[in-house]
Amino acid sequence: MNGYVEFSPSPTKESVEPQPSQAVLQEDVDMSSGSSGHENCSMGRDSQGSDCDDNGKELRMLVEPSDTHSSPDAFRLMMTEPQHNPSTSGCSSEQSAKANAHKELIRTLRELKVHLPADKKAKGKASTLAILKYALRSVKQVKANEEYYQLLMSSESQPCSMDVPSYTVEQVEGITSEYIVKNADMFAVAVSLVSGKILYISNQVASIFHCKKDAFSDAKFVEFLAPHDVSVFHSYTTPYKLPPWSMCCGVDSFTQECMEEKSFFCRVSVGKHHESEIRYQPFRMTPYLVKVQEQQGAESQLCCLLLAERIHSGYEAPRIPPEKRIFTTTHIPNCLFQDVDERAVPLLGYLPQDLIETPVLVQLHPSDRPLMLAIHKKILQAGGQPFDYSPIRFRARNGEYITLDTSWSSFINPWSRKISFIIGRHKVRVGPLNEDVFAASPCPEGKTPHPSIQELTEQIHRLLMQPVPHSGSSGYGSLGSNGSHEHLMSQTSSSDSNGHEESRWRKSGISKNGSKTQTRSHFSHESGEQKEIAVTEMQSSTPAQAKAAPTVERDSSGSSLPKASFPEELAYKNQPACSYQQISCLDSVIRYLESCNEAATLKRKCEFPANIPSRKATVSPGLHAEEAAPPPSKVSSHAEVRARLSSLTLPDKAESVVSLTSQCSYSSTIVHVGDKKPQPELETVEDAVSGPESLDGAPGGLSQEKGPLQKLGLTKEVLAAHTQREEQGFLQRFREVSRLGALQAHRQNYRAQASERAAPGLRNASGMDSSWKKTGKNRKLKSKRVKTRDSSESTGSGGPVSHRPPLVGLNATAWSPSDTSQSSCPSAPFPAPVPAYPLPVFEAPGITSTPAPPEAAHSSFTVPVVPMGAQPDFAVQPLPLAAPLAPVLAFMLPSYPFPPANPNLSHAFFPGQPHFPAQPTFASEMTPASQADFPSQTPLLRQQCTCPVTPPAATVTSGRASPPLFQSRGSSPLQLNLLQLEEAPEGSTGAAGTSGTTGTAAAGLDCTPGTSRDRQPKAPSTCKEPSDTQNSDALSTSSDLLNLLLAEDLCSATGSALSGSGASATSDSLGSGSLGCDASRSGAGSSDTSHTSKYFGSIDSSENNHKAKVSTDTEESEQFIKYVLQDPIWLLVANTDDSVMMTYQLPSRDLESVLREGRERLKLLQRAQPRFTEGQRRELREVHPWVQTGGLPAAIDVAECVYCKSERKGDICLPYEEDSPSPGLCDTSEAKEEEGEQLTGPRIEAQT
């Protein structure tokens, strides 16, 4: 009874009354009880008493159709009846028949036991129940596959059969014979995809399987496959996946490549080779799709034509050579095989499907399993780089172990920075003792893994869930660090923005894009604590802010901060911080899309609310083309230039400086990798965010750090250190900018109204208000420049500015570009004007909030002065002034930095320029309070410059692709600042001369009147002038370096400054199209408080209206006024047409003499450049192959340089040497040549 009680079917099945189908039911019962008896009698023989007899009695009893079995109660009685009534089993003919059936059942069960996989045997014995369940499952699987094929063929037979060749059976034999005749281990078989039956099989099967060919006739091919390979066979023989036979028949011989590409592995067997088991042989099968006509006149049916080749052990003849016993595997962090190389089949004995999704550790020798933890630790440290490790022992299918030399690497998810899968490359060192690796293992391991395996797997999984600390070369690790990727990424993603990750990306940057890494190294001077602050703050920042900030940094034209004001961007508070790589990556994508053309820019505008004028004018590499030959009269080109320049000024963009700047800047970028000078931008941001505070001590602090350039080798370590610090600074700056987002919400409507009211001529190509486009970047760089130049006092913070002595030779001009707010006197007055280019100045309307008509500004160059009382909300401490100084727009020659006023110079160098009195009293509408007289300043009456409203050639606009003075030898603000810092010890003459130092209208380089006007505060500005306007020129004094940079980048893209359109990037800064000739400008520039960048001082009438609307938030105005920037007047000059500038030009110098002097200076400067040792050169050659070949990297090896017009590929770009000096700017050209030579020197050495 034991067997029956254990394995009997459900009583409900047996309680059915006898019917015609009762025979089948009885047969099932016979199988159950018979198998039980067989198990206990023939196999187990471990049960007590007469179990077999009882089972026989049960069998005979159950098969009798009896009405007493019609209920469960009767069934229970039936179960107990044999015990109490042994006489029920009589000897009759029916009983003998049942006994024969029983014997047949036992034989069938024995046959089934042979097919039962070893892993399903309990304790090495085949359970009868397990056998029956396995058989039932196999039948269901085959039947399901057949049904699947029927459905598949009914829906796909027509499309598939259109191009499929049709053959008869004889033709199939003929076409396949040429492929199998040369290989005795190969056979061909045609399997119907409709019925699954074998329509044709070659004669080789008889020798391969040692059976007759008739064994395959009218049989289904899947019946000969190992049960667990049936699904593999079906998956690879789906009709739409099969290539037609025509692909193969056109070739003389079947190529191995073709087989490897489409082949799969299955085990095939015809029958049992031994009485106890069936030996399956592994085959590589290559399927093709054909049509076969089974009989003459019958309809052709789709078939799968298989070319099957038997696989031999790689250690048996013909052996695989030891040097070729190599295969690869991949597994995922939870230590399950993900993929196994086909080359592993003859070496391990496993088919790919045998190992996939099985534990790796199970296949290893128990003593080698702990090594996997150490291996995975090193994998994590290597960050994708391959490395070798000690040999491990891997178990083959026959149960023996093979010693493998292993090499490991990994693929890193580019977003999560976690390992996605591990790649192992294995080479067989020692083969198995039993060379037949396909033999079955004598002691198969149980299905349940050992507890130690589970524990070790969990440890490895936890380990690999950590972010990878090094980038290495795997996957995206190297991708994220090209120049265009770098800086958007700090936002979007994972919490992996840590020092390890940054070092990882840093390495990647070094290996993939030297120029980018080197450029990034300029901004790597921020301290570690700043980086920590950045990380913590970013983690607390909102994702929307994160998105806004990179966009901000990307735009950096002032549109950045307004974007942060979206309420939805402030919605989520405690989101994880985004990584540096993700921010820069997203930023590069967005910048690229926006740089394609104006249409792309307009397309991006759809992403934002309609009240936002535009995301930005596009800070993008796409402007390079525009720089080469800008259409002078196009508003769009100017607008893009404006955006481009603004983006250059943003410190946060330093990471992608290479992608933003000209190709010529590459060599200059390389030079400054070793530069250790600190960057003050981060401090500026901190100042801006923390509240108004004086930046008085900043220049002094910087001057102390302006030591001579240290001679440092361009090693991987130096680049890595710079890169890490730069990323830290980037994250910090991003966070600081993001914090400003909360203060911007109230300006959303303001900006929308501004964009609506803005005059068409004053708009950017992107429709963005130029008034606020500049705030983002210029704000920070303004403060940076304050620290860079000691001569400047930063009022960018909007806080009270500490008293500083005036700079000698600088004319402190209070320039009031706004109709609503007259500019206050600068914080530091300067004794006298320097000979200057007279530019038209516009009368500033009264301090009323009514915007002045744009047309009223042409005729005169008057400078209204705003009293200090007009801006009480800004605690700016003005220096005493005798009188407001006239905003005489002067261009400071490089050779005359801050000279005392000398009227004679004006005639000597400016024949057409009228003499300026020392500084006569300037009658202004209002005098600033608490102004002390300066002895050198005499009252100046408001006077009008005799500059024609429209210069003679105002209508003639020539798109000067690259004026020599403003060509970019290092077009990023960072590069230029570093250059200036380097040259400062030698004398700031050249740098100071070339870059406009604000502080003087006549002598200061930054003579752009619309200084404060050009900056649009991040908060609504009041009608009163912010303190920034008072110190506007002083602010630009510190920005001289940046001004020079911007002018350089602007040179090729400014177009005509005389066009009068608001898009003129630099002409806007004066409030006049160019030289004050823009009829659309208002007053003396417009809107002091709008603080549009002086560089693009297109103060729209809309800005004036803006100021009429914004009136009260003075505290926030103070907060945002810190980000105001001022522009130098020479930007106007740069954009002025040559025909106009002829009136004011200096005597031209001989081009050859200029070049000769420049080359001499270059030779002198080269001596101070770093010298590379042989080891350092080897490192450079390893990281940058182009160093060895001597050219530029392919990415930037352009045929024509957009600045110097050099058409020689790979030529060292020496800007300014090939261009004749700009009229009146010869000394500046010299200074630029000097800087350009200094930059390119180390590059020449590096290439040698």
Swiss-Prot record:
Ranges of Basic and acidic residues composition bias in the record: 523-534, 1103-1112
Phosphothreonine: residues carrying this PTM: 955
GO cellular component: cytoplasm; nucleus; perinuclear region of cytoplasm
Alphabetized GO MF terms: transcription cis-regulatory region binding; transcription coactivator activity; transcription corepressor binding
Primary localization class, coarse: nucleus
Region feature Important for protein stability, mapped onto this chain: 474-478
InterPro entries documented for this protein: PAS, PAS-like_dom_sf, PAS_fold_3, Per1-3_PAS-A, Period_circadian-like_C, Period_circadian_regulator
Gene3D superfamilies, alphabetized: PAS domain
Keywords: Acetylation, Biological rhythms, Cytoplasm, Nucleus, Phosphoprotein, Repeat, Transcription, Transcription regulation, Ubl conjugation
Induction pattern: Exhibits circadian rhythm expression. In the SCN and harderian gland, maximum levels at ZT12. Maximum levels in the eye and liver at ZT18. Under constant darkness, maximum levels, in SCN and harderian gland, during subjective day at CT12. In the eye, maximum levels at CT18.
Residue segments, region Interaction with PPARG: 873-1058
Domain PAS, residue spans: 175-242, 315-381
Segments carrying motif LXXLL: 302-306, 1042-1046
GO terms (BP aspect): chromatin remodeling; circadian regulation of gene expression; entrainment of circadian clock by photoperiod; fatty acid metabolic process; gluconeogenesis; glycogen biosynthetic process; lactate biosynthetic process; negative regulation of circadian rhythm
Region entry CSNK1E binding domain, spans: 506-706
Motif (Nuclear localization signal): 773-789
Motif Nuclear export signal 3 boundaries: 974-981
Motif Nuclear export signal 2, residue numbers: 456-465
One Pfam family named in its UniProt record: PAS_3
PROSITE patterns documented for this protein: PAS (PS50112)
Residue spans of biased composition, Basic residues class: 774-787
Tissue specificity of this protein: Expressed in the brain, mainly in the suprachiasmatic nucleus (SCN). Expression also found in the harderian gland, lung, eye, intestine, liver and skeletal muscle.
Bias type Low complexity, positions: 816-827, 987-1004, 1057-1080
Disordered: annotated span: 1-57, 467-563, 619-638, 675-708, 751-829, 950-971, 984-1035, 1057-1113, 1215-1248
Cited SUPFAM superfamilies: PYP-like sensor domain (PAS domain) (SSF55785)
Name listed for the protein in its UniProt record: Period circadian protein homolog 2
Organism: Spalax judaei (Judean Mountains blind mole rat)
UniProt lineage: Eukaryota, Metazoa, Chordata, Craniata, Vertebrata
Gene from which this protein is expressed: PER2
